[in-house]
Amino acid sequence: EPAIYFKEQFLDGXGFTDXRIKEK
């Protein structure tokens, strides 16, 4: 879900890739 994906990205503060890797 984009919402969670965006939330993770903001929490990490690293970027889209970081969030994506974390999610996957």
From Swiss-Prot:
Any one of the GO CC terms: cytolytic granule
Cell compartment(s), UniProt: Endoplasmic reticulum lumen; Cytoplasm, Cytosol; Cytolytic granule; Secreted, Extracellular space, Extracellular matrix
Signal peptide: none
Swiss-Prot/TrEMBL keywords: Calcium, Chaperone, Cytoplasm, Cytoplasmic vesicle, Endoplasmic reticulum, Extracellular matrix, Lectin, Lysosome, Metal-binding, Sarcoplasmic reticulum, Secreted, Zinc
Function summary: Calcium-binding chaperone that promotes folding, oligomeric assembly and quality control in the endoplasmic reticulum (ER) via the calreticulin/calnexin cycle. This lectin interacts transiently with almost all of the monoglucosylated glycoproteins that are synthesized in the ER. Interacts with the DNA-binding domain of NR3C1 and mediates its nuclear export. Involved in maternal gene expression regulation. May participate in oocyte maturation via the regulation of calcium homeostasis.
BP terms from Gene Ontology: protein stabilization
Main location: endoplasmic reticulum
GO molecular function terms attached to this record: calcium ion binding; carbohydrate binding
Family the entry assigns: Belongs to the calreticulin family.
Tissues and organs where the protein is expressed, per its UniProt entry: Pancreas.
Keyword flag Transferase: no
Keyword Chaperone: yes
Assembly information from the UniProt record: Monomer. Component of an EIF2 complex at least composed of CELF1/CUGBP1, CALR, CALR3, EIF2S1, EIF2S2, HSP90B1 and HSPA5. Interacts with PDIA3/ERp57 and SPACA9. Interacts with TRIM21. Interacts with NR3C1. Interacts with PPIB. Interacts (via P-domain) with PDIA5. Interacts with CLCC1.
Protein name: Calreticulin
